[in-house]
Amino acid sequence: MKFSKEAKEYALDLINIRENNINYNDMYCELFYYRFCNEKDDINDLMLNQGYTSKDAIKYKIEDFFEIAFEEESEIYVDEALREEKEDEYLSNPYVKAINISHVKQGKYTLFKDKYEPFELFARDDIKVLDNYIEQPQIGYFTKPFSFLALKERDVTWMSLNPNEINTMKKGIERASGNVLVLGLGLGYFPFMISLKDDVKDITIIERNKDVIALFKDNILPNFKHKEKIHIIQDDAIRYVQKLQKDTSFDYIFADLWHNQEDALRLYITLVKEERRLNIPTDYWLETSILAYVRRMIIFVFLGQLIEGTSDMDYVEAATIEDSCINGLYFAMKDMEFTSKKQLKEFLSDASIKELLINEKI
């Protein structure tokens, strides 16, 4: 792997940006994990008596929680990332209005109402990738309790119809048309929303969990206005797609088989290859985050080459799927030459990374 002086300088800048991306992502993940929320009285005191905005008050409380002082880059990662959400935007959603379930237990699964406390932080949308591949989180909060439908298996929450779910599916809902194949059932939000579209004629859902299918059919599907469009097949989604012929009647595919970008990695790589084979427009839940995750790995390989002096022997063993992917990326790139900042920047674009995953053995 060779770098011109200009390309090397840019790669070193990207290594620093990658570190910031990871640090702020880890910060928010910790806040989400502990369901960190600020005491409403504390926030109100900061706002009413000290002139803080709700956003500034939350930022102050985060600094206090971690015992840190945010640096200059926090304007992008915190100030511009935080947004007060309006509950009416979500309560007026057609699915939310139609599916009025407070508590249903069926076998080991339970449909219930989860909630965010006032000023509790959550990911409201997929990340936004800015210039030079800065990954800006999209973080929301409500100023009063906000309830949403969720599904748990025994005591573990499995999926939720929270603002993140609604916002991250908007693009796919807009693009779906004709005969649609949906990989993964979940709470049926995506099928419900596209079933309302006149240009969506038929919806086939692939879900391998028979208990989730039964729960959906018994409690959620009866609330669909266009039940006649819905067909559910119990099968493994990857196996089903791999058996499809090029002349399949599907016009569009939407894949939602993972909980996060790490969980998605292998499934996504398999599916983008199938997308190319079938030549069917396909969208993937959290695709921006998935590609950003792969971009981080590529930049990690740059770090190894430019700073640590790694060689082929450092990319042989793999303890995790991420390690395996990094190894594959290294061997796919080891003979490449980067001659300019522009070339390197284009190589790290979403389209370029997707082509790399399709064409190389990663």
Label each region the model flagged.
Residues 145-149, 163-179:
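Conserved alpha-helix/loop element of class I SAM-dependent methyltransferases that forms part
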Residues 181, 201-204:
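Conserved beta-strand positions in the Rossmann-like core of class I SAM-dependent methyltransferases
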Residues 210-252, 260-261:
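S-adenosyl-L-methionine
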Residues 177-188:
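Conserved class I S-adenosyl-L-methionine
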Residues 204-210:
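Conserved acidic E/D residue at the C-terminus of a beta-strand in Rossmann-like folds
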Residues 259-362:
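C-terminal substrate-binding/active-site "lid" region of AdoMet-derived donor-dependent transferases
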